[in-house]
């Protein structure tokens, strides 16, 4: 997912405020599910972030274009693990990694942890992150 950096994304120093990288990852995950046709309000279950490990490697600034890449690492009984990276494209299309995160999403139904059924697992495996 491609994102342009606007004033609202930056701090007083003109660089992207650190929590926005996590927001960009959330948008990319959500967009992948939406594009694949998943409607959580109709499915009866939803995912919540249960763990997040992040590494801030470099900064984006106003006007930059960044891209979020998402990769499914593991699909468990009641959760999934994703790796997400945010890249900045520079001169000659060189990629520079700005941010890396490993995110665990727990599957919930009615406010409680729930097993991911086989049809949902098949759906997740088909999502183009």
Provide a role label for each language-model segment.
Residues 1-50, 108-129:
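Hot-dog-fold acyl-thioester-processing enzymes
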Residues 56, 61-62, 73-129:
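HotDog/MaoC-like acyl-thioester-processing domains
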Residues 50-56, 67-69:
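Short structured motifs
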Residues 46, 65-66:
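Generic preference for hydrophobic/aromatic residues in regular secondary structure cores
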